[in-house]
């Protein structure tokens, strides 16, 4: 048995002293993990977060310019001309409009605007407005300077409140043709006094009719006289209306009372983001590509979870916390020490922390020492594929779907609920698609990395042929001496197998001879052991028979 052990040690020593080259991959101290279709929290050397999660908490300019911030005024207050609103905003361009939640200057005289949400959307979608006079004061032969205490003793700056003059209110008949070449937004109203007395004091009669007509509309109005709850100290109301007069169209108004007549209209120009933000955020000295009600953000990432109401050049919103794409390898640290005397091992044993210049590479040992080098070609091809994956994800998710925080009246509550549900479901679909796409790409990336290592291993295996033997750990033990220059030819694919064939053949025969001698000795010892064991068993059986016959426990009768 001592002979067998000695031969085995000599054989191991013979193989261990061979020059060796291993194929491996990078390992780092990264704590990054990604999810795949089949695994969660897979450790990887590198990962790219695809989801932008931060904002600056400010109102910023966008690519279309600065926002229009209405500090104390609402949009309808600006449109109808609340006397407390700043008229200096005329002609100013905006990219989006900001209303403050605490704004108090809306409709000073109590009442409702017909289709208010549509009006706000129309106005905010423009980029600027210009006031234009529709009916000058000389149009009317009644009093046109009606005021209200609710409007700070004044009245709207874009409408005239027509009342009786000298105790009379003759029929007012006026028309205006749009020769501006652009659409004009015009506004009017109908007054509803609280009592018949107030009605007569203002318009001399209780039964009045007002008609407003263009080529597209024909509206007829009558007052609804009666007391209502006090609002702003008034029991009367005004119903507010609006329409758009297109180029070449004519507006005709005919009334014998209760008319709040158009005075100025608005020419709306350009196109903005069409968004109204109701927020107290402060204006910052910043320009962003994407603005939300929470703040602005700049990002090159394909997704964001800041707000689904983001506008501008924005990444697609998905309501998850993180979405990581694997852009590196499985991070598998070395599973064991490198064996006796620091012997090297290949990818079967885990990754290499010392491989920093590439994802895949080689490690070798020879008489000149130990060396490591990255395989730049396979690494670059893998990097190019991953770059293509990122672009592919962006392209696949590039279909625009912009959610707008729609405004609905109280009557349209159910419609608003349905709209929100549809928006939420579409967002859920986008989030699911994004997550699934990334899971698929992560699975594919990690599988490709495994394939890349195997391809590199097989490439070296084909190059070495019978000049080397695999050790089962991702390495090749060479049958010939291979200095650093020789190792470089293996790495770069210029290895000359024929040059080392004869030396390899002799070394292989030498090693195989030792193996055969070992095997022959083992067979002799096996036969010897078998024979010796059989003799021991036979002698033991004979001794048992002798003992049994001597004490009479066993008797042998021979019959002839």
Identify the role of each PLM range:
Residues 2-560:
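Extracellular/luminal domains of secretory-pathway glycoproteins
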